Amino acid sequence: MSKLFDSRLADVIRKPVITEKATNALDLNQYTFEVDHRAAKPQIKAAVEALFSVKVIGVNTMNPPRRTRRVGKFSGKRSQVKKAIVRLAEGDKIQLFPES
């Protein structure tokens, strides 16, 4: 990998998605992240493996259309969001929630 690619790995993953559906998928060893909309599946896989030291089996992505927001008479668009569902190898785990 080139140094440019290595430096962008941390910028690929924005934040984990915490919804009921994403939380239920944790039982299947699948983690959902919001990622940069320009990121490709190999980049997402490399970023997760490098940042969390786990083995990624597969990556599914979804790129829904931008939503229009309206405030008074002004209309605008929300920022582009791309989600990635990452499936990990058996036995690997990512600590998303702090343990109490």
From Swiss-Prot:
**Gene Ontology CC:** ribonucleoprotein complex; ribosome
Task: Tell me which UniProt keywords the record has, alphabetically.
Answer: Ribonucleoprotein, Ribosomal protein, RNA-binding, rRNA-binding
Q: In this UniProt entry, which cysteines form S-S bonds?
A: none
- For the keyword Ribonucleoprotein, the answer is yes
Biological process GO terms, please? translation
**Per UniProt, what is one GO molecular function of this protein?**
structural constituent of ribosome
* NCBIfam families given in the database record: PRK05738.1-3, PRK05738.2-4, PRK05738.3-1, PRK05738.3-2, PRK05738.3-4
Describe its partners and assembly state: Part of the 50S ribosomal subunit. Contacts protein L29, and trigger factor when it is bound to the ribosome.
Described by its record, this protein's role is as follows:
One of the early assembly proteins it binds 23S rRNA. One of the proteins that surrounds the polypeptide exit tunnel on the outside of the ribosome. Forms the main docking site for trigger factor binding to the ribosome.
**Family under the similarity heading:** Belongs to the universal ribosomal protein uL23 family.
Q: What is this protein called?
A: Large ribosomal subunit protein uL23
Organism in which the protein naturally occurs: Prochlorococcus marinus (strain AS9601)
